[in-house]
Amino acid sequence: MWEAAARRWLESKGLRFIAANVRERGGEIDLIMRDGKTTVFVEVRYRRSAQFGGAAASVTWSKQHKLLQTARLWLARHNGSFDTVDCRFDVLAFTGNDVEWFKDAFNDRS
């Protein structure tokens, strides 16, 4: 449900959809989008309230590591790598009725 809402929201901001719920060994990427020539790996989070830090705070270092690994595998399957493909990792956080878009929230150099 939240991935579909995130996709619509990001498309309204000009991003183009590539894939959803991409599973590779050890992880899953909620959305893969294109922003111009940049491949964007999107983690979608929802929390009812900002108590305990809200949605964005739930993307831990461990989760970031899994997303990086999953993206690395996906890129390899599509003849790419972090060295050859312009990409970034965004977090789209739904907290109650608020939407926050954290562009380039983390990267493979973090």
Curated annotation (Swiss-Prot):
Gene3D superfamilies: 3.40.1350.10
Pfam family, one: UPF0102
InterPro entries from the UniProt entry: Restrct_endonuc-II-like (IPR011335), tRNA_endonuc-like_dom_sf (IPR011856), UPF0102_YraN-like (IPR003509)
GO MF annotation, one: nucleic acid binding
N-terminal signal peptide: none
HAMAP family named in the record: UPF0102 (MF_00048)
Similarity section: Belongs to the UPF0102 family.
Protein name (Swiss-Prot/TrEMBL): UPF0102 protein CKO_04542
UniProt organism field: Citrobacter koseri (strain ATCC BAA-895 / CDC 4225-83 / SGSC4696)
